[in-house]
Each structure stands twice: as structure tokens, then as C-alpha cells.
Amino acid sequence: MADFYQNGIVTTLHNLENRSVEALESELNEFAKKRPLGLILPSLFSELEGKALPATIDHIAKVPYLNEVVIGLDRATKEQYQYALKFFSHLPQQHRVLWNDGPRLQALDEELRKLGLAPKELGKGRNVWYCMGFVLASNRVESVALHDCDILTYDRSLLARLIYPVANPQFNYEFCKGFYARVADGKINGRVSRLLVTPLLRALKHTLGQNDYLEFMDSFRYPLAGEFSFRRDVLNDIRIPSDWGLEIGVLSEMHRNYSHNRLCQSDIADAYDHKHQDLSLNNDQGGLSKMSIDITKALFRKLATQGTVFNTETFRTIKATYFRIALDFIETYHNDAVMNGLKLDIHSEEKAVELFAKNIMKAGTSFLDNPMETPFIPSWNRVVSAKPDVLECLLRAVEEDHKEFLGQ
């Protein structure tokens, strides 16, 4: 049972009564008559062969209020794309699969690259960006949710609670961030959020002083959750990172573009588990190690745009302050786990904190060495300005792929 406490400066919508999914969907059906609703699913082909996504699609097939489902498919051959078309074919909703590795979308990507407007890195950010473009191009929905495809505990109530705040015409929210407790198999998970992001935000407050952005970011209960929902207009202006800083980058864009009362977070699940990344102690180009560097750089970049001046001494102070705060958090999480009959390995927690502390310095050094680094993908408004027919080209490429390969 959740409490009703409002922390920070972003509205929190709680799960106070465990309201039935049928009751939520009944209202969403009515909302969808005036404000059509959609869903974006960024996926790797490998996820089609896993345990999570097939079960997720079975749930989504029962969702009555969706007008469109847009699936972004990465790392797929032609045969795998054809398999994906069949895999998603039992969805009763209007749906399309973006074959991101196919020749038509690759040709469009090359056109944008020549204009300096294509995503620079492969990954979830690029996948999500093209899916957002397709939502704009198809013009079928007014509000859209986005969630990952590796959720092992998926239930369609998650989607209902995620999209409800931007679907209800009596609410004025432009954006909703999902949150949940990362507890599974008798353990507390979510190491990067618990042991990096929250203590780093607190360390930045101590080091740099209070500012609106840090207060905003620290208001989110699970800032790294991959579940969002938006009003359609948001998709035109948002600039998202193509690296592991995606979730932090999206929140930063919401802070830049909208007042706090247009944003909210919603409790979307009692239980949540998905695939876990390796800590990658000896490889800062993979796993949670690379993730921690990219996330930290995303925070530094945002603060720099607000006038914060960084140097090596600043980063050393931030790192030292972070380290002390993070170690204190380990004791807090351990006591919370013990009281709830859960396990928490203090040794592995401290190893993670030590790695993250080192990576704060690596992120700071990279930030100073590459001051012109711009991992952001351009907004769709900018792309349309440079290539006015880009959305029509994107829509045509996806539809032609669908028509050519669906029956083969």
C-alpha cells in the first residue's frame, strides 16, 4: 500500500486503492474517443525470443483503448524482420514494425546523416527517436506511452496507469514518468538509481548549492525508469541522447520545456523485474560501468548549460562528497532490506559505489576533454525544417516494408 506523500516539486500520482485494471480501462476507452492513444515499444530482435516480450504482447493484445502500436526493431536481418511481422501480427490494434536495419530506413538515415541530422550512435535512443518520428508521421494518436520490452513482471495495468495521466482530458499533464519498487527474487535491485543517481544528485546539491534543476531531478522516485508517456506535441521538440543518458536526458528536456505543474510521475507497478546489466568492473565501455559514465556526463552537460563552471577540483569534490553519501545509503538500504526479509549484499554494494565513484571522475575528465561533444539527436522540428518531407518519407518506408514482406 502506497502513502500519499508529495515529495519534491513534481506531482506524484500514487496507487492508493489497487484499483482494478478493468475500471481504469473503462475510463481510458472513453478518453480514447476524444484523444486517441498509442504505445511505442523499442525492441531488439533477441527480445522476441526471450521470455518477457511474448508474455507482454499477450497482455497488450487485450488492451482495448490503443489506436496504434509502434514497434522499433533493432539488430534484425530480413528473415528476422519477417519473423517479427508474424510475431506481432496477433495484435488486434493498428500496428507497424520499424525495421531499423532494413535498406529503406537505412537509406533515409543516410540522407539525414548527410545533413548532419541522423543519430550518431546505435541503441535505444536512436530506436525511440525513429518511433517518435513515425508517431508524428502517422498522425493517429494524441497521447503515447513508451515502455521497455524486457519486463518480466508485465501486466497491462502498468500501461493503464502509465498513460492515464496524459490521456485524461481533465488533467493538464504533458508528460508522465513511471516509477515502481525494484524488488524481485528476495532482493532490492536498481543499483544505478539507488547507488549512483540519488547520492550523486545529493552530492551535487552539497557541492554546487541548491538549484531548480537538481531539486527537479531529485523529485523523481525512479529517474532511470524506461517508462514514459507524452502528449503528442512533446515529440516535436524533445532532444534525446543516443547513449545511456536517455532517461536523464528526457527528464532534462521536460525541465527545459515545461513548467513543473505540467509534469508528473505515476506508481505503475507493485512488482517490477527485467534483465539485469553486468557491473563490468573491468570494462568501462559496457554494462553498468558505461551506463554510469553516460548518465553522469548527461547531468554535467545539463548543469553546464545553466552556467555551472566545472574543473578538475570541482569533480574531485563531487566525487568525495558522493562517496560518503553513497556509503551512508548502503546502510539505509541494508536496514530496509532486513526489516522486509530481503537480502542485500553490503560487499557487492560497496564495490558498485567504488566503481561509480571512479566513473564520476572519468565522466568529468571526458566532459573537460570533449567540451563540444553533443550526443543529442536533433528534435523532429529541426529535422522537418531541414527536410520538409522527412515524415512522409519515414511513413512511406515503413509502409512499403510492411507491404513487401508481410506475406512472404
Name every feature range the model reports, one short phrase each.
Residues 138-152:
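Short beta-strand-to-loop acidic/aromatic patch adjacent to the donor-nucleotide binding site
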Residues 264-285:
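Active-site donor/metal-binding and catalytic loop motifs
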Residues 185-194, 208-227:
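A recurrent flexible, glycine/aromatic-enriched loop bordering the glycosyltransferase active site
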Residues 1-17, 92, 278-408:
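Terminal low-complexity segments of carbohydrate-biosynthetic enzymes
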Residues 1-62:
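N-proximal low-complexity "stem/linker" segments adjacent to membrane-targeting elements
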Residues 242, 252-271:
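Catalytic donor-sugar/metal-binding loop of nucleotide-sugar-dependent glycosyltransferases
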Residues 17-20, 80-140:
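Active-site-proximal specificity loops/subdomain of glycosyltransferases
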Residues 152-182:
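Conserved donor-nucleotide/metal-binding helix-loop-beta segment in metal-dependent transferases, i.e.
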